[in-house]
Amino acid sequence: MRLPYLVCYDISDEGRLNRVYRFMKGKGFHIQYSVFYCILTDVELKEMKAEILKLIHSRYDDVRIYPLPNNSLVAVLGVGDRIPDGVEVFY
């Protein structure tokens, strides 16, 4: 079963930041500078975590993966032109 996740990161080195960004572009929808919305299976989530661990320096970088409830409402304040299909938005 596929579940939604919010992946947020703070990478201290520009090279690692670019590598994580390029990797994440293939995994989810880029919704803010260092934030991606992903819909993943358990296997895809596990593989994504393993790959991210290879790309970051665990002492200096911070990556957080938040599970989101299915069918959750999303509030977008400000410019909201980056909403993925299937995500409901209320104003």
From Swiss-Prot:
Classification via CDD domains: Cas2_I_II_III
Pfam family, one: CRISPR_Cas2
Residues reported in the UniProt entry to bind Mg(2+): D10
EC number assigned by the record: 3.1.-.-
Cofactor(s) the record lists: Mg(2+)
GO MF terms held by the record: metal ion binding; RNA endonuclease activity
Presence of keyword DNA-binding: no
GO annotation, biological process: defense response to virus; maintenance of CRISPR repeat elements
Entry keywords, A to Z: Antiviral defense, Endonuclease, Hydrolase, Magnesium, Metal-binding, Nuclease
InterPro entries tied to this protein: CRISPR_associated_Cas2 (IPR021127), Virulence_VapD/CRISPR_Cas2 (IPR019199)
Keyword Chaperone: no
Entry function: CRISPR (clustered regularly interspaced short palindromic repeat), is an adaptive immune system that provides protection against mobile genetic elements (viruses, transposable elements and conjugative plasmids). CRISPR clusters contain sequences complementary to antecedent mobile elements and target invading nucleic acids. CRISPR clusters are transcribed and processed into CRISPR RNA (crRNA). Functions as a ssRNA-specific endoribonuclease. Involved in the integration of spacer DNA into the CRISPR cassette.
Family: Belongs to the CRISPR-associated endoribonuclease Cas2 protein family.
Subunit description: Homodimer, forms a heterotetramer with a Cas1 homodimer.
Protein name: CRISPR-associated endoribonuclease Cas2 2
Species of the source: Thermodesulfovibrio yellowstonii (strain ATCC 51303 / DSM 11347 / YP87)
Lineage of the organism: Bacteria, Pseudomonadati, Nitrospirota, Thermodesulfovibrionia, Thermodesulfovibrionales
Gene encoding the protein: cas2-2
